[in-house]
From Swiss-Prot:
Recorded name of the encoding gene: mdtK
Keywords: Antiport, Cell inner membrane, Cell membrane, Ion transport, Membrane, Sodium, Sodium transport, Transmembrane, Transmembrane helix, Transport
Protein name: Multidrug resistance protein MdtK
Transmembrane segments: 11-31, 53-73, 93-113, 127-147, 160-180, 189-209, 243-263, 276-296, 314-334, 350-370, 387-407, 418-438
Superkingdom of origin organism: Bacteria
Matching HAMAP family: MdtK (MF_00400)
Topological type in the membrane: Multi-pass membrane protein
Amino acid sequence: MQKYISEARLLLALAIPVILAQIAQTAMGFVDTVMAGGYSATDMAAVAIGTSIWLPAILFGHGLLLALTPVIAQLNGSGRRERIAHQVRQGFWLAGFVSVLIMLVLWNAGYIIRSMQNIDPALADKAVGYLRALLWGAPGYLFFQVARNQCEGLAKTKPGMVMGFIGLLVNIPVNYIFIYGHFGMPELGGVGCGVATAAVYWVMFLAMVSYIKRARSMRDIRNEKGTAKPDPAVMKRLIQLGLPIALALFFEVTLFAVVALLVSPLGIVDVAGHQIALNFSSLMFVLPMSLAAAVTIRVGYRLGQGSTLDAQTAARTGLMVGVCMATLTAIFTVSLREQIALLYNDNPEVVTLAAHLMLLAAVYQISDSIQVIGSGILRGYKDTRSIFYITFTAYWVLGLPSGYILALTDLVVEPMGPAGFWIGFIIGLTSAAIMMMLRMRFLQRLPSAIILQRAAR
């Protein structure tokens, strides 16, 4: 029992800074929306539309680079720190190549925006302008993620938290300058949010690099000599590990986007209630997602040390802590669902629907916690392909079709509206949780030599 308590303390010490960093990141998006809304409703809508395209694109790159964390954690645990610098350099090359692709996609996103049904031309122009300003921040964001993943792979999660809050503090005044045109800058409205956010991502990257260059704990890595040229073999391995994670993230984000589109014809009350419940459950998701990042680090580190039993302990502890957290957040959601809904909207119909959907959200919080922490465990074992297959099957083969049938057809019951999609979420997330656990048990039952060989790839 003592070993689980000790492991839980280590996991929470790693996870809490990640939680705070994620809160800072979420707050940046909130600040952009509020400040653009203060300028005009059209500008706020433009930022929302632009963000809905930016997120899937940048999260694809983000997911690809998540492969670095278990690689570095495993090298750190095995005492092969002299190889870390080379992996990080290749991570920067990969981030650079992916940035170019993302920037090309975002530059041409106007075709998608202008093809939206009944979109106002002025709104479309502002959304395109926002994206074309924001896309210059894509390299800065991905370079920052490489540096952050280096730190987190070495069990240093506080720097990412600090840089996140630096970014938030810089974002507010820079937004103000470019939205309203102060200090000689042009008045850009919502487009100014894109300029400001792009600049902030570069500030965060440069601040993180400054920390890494000064950190005593990374002196040996910093001083390691090696080629700065692209290494196709290393980059191929990073892509093999990272691409399934990137695709899983992409399909998860697009799932919720598709559901939002399917709910939109049902009416304002249904759309508003669905959005409130989804926004709140997204905030609660920060907790298990951050714990999953910590579990990846601990499992990778223990496997690097050659201890499959300690890796199992880290995995089981992560799941136990995650279930405890999810139970508490579910109780909180059920107890205060109406008060939470009132923070978003005071329309009685919207509040009633949102409160009902939050009950369903509370049901799936435990499944959601298990599946996301399970994904973190599998990343630690470098078993990333299974994450993609499980996520795609659970969300797109089981969850979305079930939700569609329940919400919009009478094949099983009378059309349930948004609640049907939320039951679909429960089916999808519960299926993902079960499959993640089965895969984890399969891996952990392999001979230790095979587990360690797979982890050392």
